[in-house]
Amino acid sequence: MKKILLLFSICLISMLGYAQTNEDGKESVYIDYFSRPGSISNILAEALRNKIIEGIQEMNRVVLIDVDSNEALKAEARRRQETSAMGDVVARSEAMTTLGAKYLIQGNITSMQGIKKTDSKGKPYYKGSVSYTLKIVDPSNGTLKGTQAFSHEGLTGSIGDTPEEAILKTLDYAKISMDDFVNENFKIQGTIVQVESTKKDKAQTVYVDLGTKRGIQKGQKFTVYIEMDIAGELSLKEVGRLNVKEVLSGARSLCSVSKGGEEIMRATKEEKKLVIISRKDTFLSL
């Protein structure tokens, strides 16, 4: 009876909830509570989760919804903690799907430590070390879309006077790492609509049909592909790379061509469709 009432409440809430994709084409993604060992406090676990939420939100790529903001999901989470309901993930998946979630982000925290060190003068301090894994799941069928493990320690571990301070400072790296996480798992696709400037038959800058509505920001990187028909099947061939130079409007951005200017120019003259797909930043990337 409780389960029937819960699902009925969720159905009512869904009338006012989010669709799987909003009018700007952004996918609705719920972020669940994170699992953790008993040795890790809830305060530190929530601090990590909040930093991850901040990092994803700043990318503005998806409509991110915290399950903690939805009373039906909070109630369902409490229900799962009852002995009779432990391990029942079906109802939770049903809840997510009914509420319009395209994907669900789940987190599992492996460790959060402040490792004691001593400086050259013999003074003790602590170095943060945080490890966790994020999974992206399609709640409609349980399919795993992607998974990524993170470890912030060493050069990405911060220093503190206490273990807790070192851990909390290290969490800033978790926020920063969400840029690549979003670019890797929530790719965005568009097209080159016009070549803006050229030099010696090479495209130098181009306009693309993506802007603020899809969360595009200055510095975003794209891979450029030519759309080809091979024996009746559409295929993509990589021909270049772009960097967003300026976001002009909701649906337009100016990009500099960092690779493949000649191929892009040739394809434009031949009126071939040039598809762009977002990519994550790398240390040596153009």
Per-region residue spans from a language model:
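Positively charged n-region of N-terminal signal peptides that target proteins for export
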Residues: M1-I4, A19
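Sec-dependent N-terminal signal peptides
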Residues: I4-I13
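C-terminal segment of classical bacterial N-terminal signal peptides
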Residues: I13-A19
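C-terminal/domain-edge helix-coil "capping" segments
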Residues: Q20-G25, P139-R214, K218, V247-L286
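N-terminal segment of the mature soluble domain
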Residues: G25-D32, I40-N108, T143-T147, I216-Q220, ...
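Short coil-to-beta-strand transition motifs
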Residues: Y103, V182-I188, E233-G240
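Amphipathic beta-strand/beta-sheet edge segments enriched in Tyr/Trp
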Residues: Y103-L155, L248
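Ser/Thr/Gly-rich low-complexity blocks that favor extended beta-strand/coil architectures
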Residues: T212-L242
